[in-house]
Amino acid sequence: MPTVFPHDSVGLVTPQTAHFSEPLALACGRSLPAYDLIYETYGQLNAARSNAVLICHALSGHHHAAGFHSADDRKPGWWDSCIGPGKPIDTTKFFVVSLNNLGGCNGSTGPSSIDPDTGKPFGANFPVVTVEDWVNSQARLADLLGIDTWAAVIGGSLGGMQALQWTISYPNRVRHCLAIASAPKLSAQNIAFNEVARQAILTDPEFHGGSFQERGVIPKRGLMLARMVGHITYLSDDSMGEKFGRGLKSEKLNYDFHSVEFQVESYLRYQGEEFSGRFDANTYLLMTKALDYFDPAANFNDDLAKTFANATARFCVMSFTTDWRFSPARSRELVDALMAARKDVCYLEIDAPQGHDAFLIPIPRYLQAFGNYMNRISL
């Protein structure tokens, strides 16, 4: 429990809430008449307002990307290894904004928020949101903060998709786009994994059609299974083998179906239990659908190069060798399209055994490459 924070930490941070009363039209055809976005900032906005960086989170992420909320916090924000003084996203140089997206469950308006029309939680009645919807809401937050142009928009996984969408929806408001461990659209296999996770939630008897909050219950089993399936895809076979192998929890097998016998079983159950106690099931459904629906080239006759024709940003694309959820081949597909569109793009493939989750881990070569790129950004 840190009472004196590390020298490269942003230290104590306080979340802020932005309220928007102007309706937000959504891709699904519905609109949100009003909504809140919770966010944090790190560093100082310069006089020219030219040093702002937007952090876009992945499926289970949120606004708390760096620092601590109190001196008693056991863990810092989810990307603390990359944000802070002297880190790749250097807060002595950049003013960093990190938010929880619409539909989230960490303070921004989402399924667990109260629907003003009913006085009850939105639940399953919360509209389906897309990556494009998120970017539109983020643009309104930028307007509120007086930020006309982002020095960089950065994200990993689903966050990388948002960074890419920024260069399409608001091509003149982004100078650098960093898409890390991401893809221009999901593969059929990825959509299949998301569907298995959704079915685990939807078929949990405690889901109650999404109205579980009104009944004072949560679909714990469904959320647990969804997280277990998802977590397997975030790791690599090599990393799981190195960490767990075929290690047993006890000295012998029990020859039954209920005991936790292998160490990897124990790990997955722990991950599922922990996740089911902090995440909203309806939000999980929304996030996986946003992933599935992301396919910006569909609006350009499936021509990915044409998709980025109007982009003015410089691009940095990063992938990890053992990431099979968002493989290096998907990043190279994106890079090829950007080159065909004659965009300024660099590509980094990091040799790392940790799989998809490598983008969250302080791997020295990754941090060095990330920092080198950010150091090149002029303000």
UniProtKB/Swiss-Prot annotation:
Substrate binds at residues 227, 357. It catalyses: L-homoserine + succinyl-CoA = O-succinyl-L-homoserine + CoA. InterPro entries: AB_hydrolase_1, AB_hydrolase_fold, HAT_MetX-like. The active site is at 157 (nucleophile), 323, 356. Requires MetW for activity. GO terms for cellular component: cytoplasm. It is found in: Cytoplasm. GO terms for biological process: homoserine metabolic process; methionine biosynthetic process. The record marks 325 as: Important for acyl-CoA specificity. HAMAP family: MetX_acyltransf. This is Homoserine O-succinyltransferase. It comes from Pseudomonas syringae pv. syringae (strain B728a).
